[in-house]
């Protein structure tokens, strides 16, 4: 099998409009959670989220196009541009051998909501002709492939909160099997809208700490009461190791393991077994290396954090890696989370630093591992793992190693 490496990364979330500012804020333990400003949430049981701030879509999309493109696509375009520029390709790039895998859990939910209201109040003839394209998850990859001229495979993953991680696995397969030499992975989500917040709130999935937003998301803490919705995008450029080496590319990391599994249990409630099998598969594919750090799924929900902790204990026994969840800082970005957290994991490898799990305030007997509480830690990292688990029992895990 061909070796697959990361040569470009990009990221946008509630803590920054690019990868460097985002990662710095994450490592500093800052929180991007605050009161919702994208709509009036006064009458909602949940009034907080991790919104991308100071984002100007006109810097990404031409003025005439802004209303035609949903916010999740706008954020994705921004992160993809950063990753492509970071990869430093020349003009001679063979774009027929360059593909894309896009990921989103919900896609253009704000546009679906908006046009549903228009249809109900003003009739079907008033629906925008751009509504359907703007709502489709695969339009994220479609528009980015058009912008960059990428003519290889164009695939989309829609597996809830595991989508971004599954997209990385699909990119690996495309390169390893010879269907492409390079792949761009982009996960994006922007579901902070009345229907999005209202829907998750009705499931009792979200934290209701409206008066203390920055301490609301508290992964692995005993007093966690649900996740905080986030938005953003993460992008990674993958290519064959030999190709990257030949062109003198900066290699951030090698993707050495990928695992996926299904719980086959419940539409929303996770199991211990499913995540455990995904992690086992990823480790087996990687050759069972010593893992130094796990970027956990760590959603701040009572069941997930307990189950993920138990699965990690069962898998690693007495050799448990350092663990942290960065969702306390970025919020839970749903289908974009896996891509964003893969970027964070790769940057942790690059800089030799493990981001903290913020809001670790009250110890939980069922979550009793080293989650890097509140303050980042300098560590010589060689191998890192990133987990993503989604509704419908979809599980994904990736393993990266530093390339000497």
What are these regions, as identified by a protein language model?
Residues 3-7, 30-34, 211-293:
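Condensing-enzyme catalytic core mediating Claisen C-C bond formation in acyl metabolism
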Residues 121-128, 169, 173, 190-246, ...:
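Glycine-/small-residue-rich "gating" segment that lines the acyl/pantetheine channel
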Residues 59-69, 102, 122-130, 134, ...:
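Cysteine-centered functional microenvironments
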Residues 179-225, 258-272, 298-305, 320-370:
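Acyl-CoA/ACP chain-elongation machinery
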Residues 20-27, 110-124, 174-177, 197-210, ...:
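A glycine- and small-aliphatic-rich helix-loop capping segment at beta-alpha/alpha-beta transitions
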Residues 1-65, 242-254, 343-357, 401-404:
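ACP-dependent fatty acid/polyketide chain-elongation machinery
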Residues 6, 27-159, 188-199, 290-303:
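Conserved beta-ketoacyl condensing-enzyme motif
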Residues 76-88, 137-148, 154-189, 228-249, ...:
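Active-site-proximal alpha-helical scaffold in enzymes
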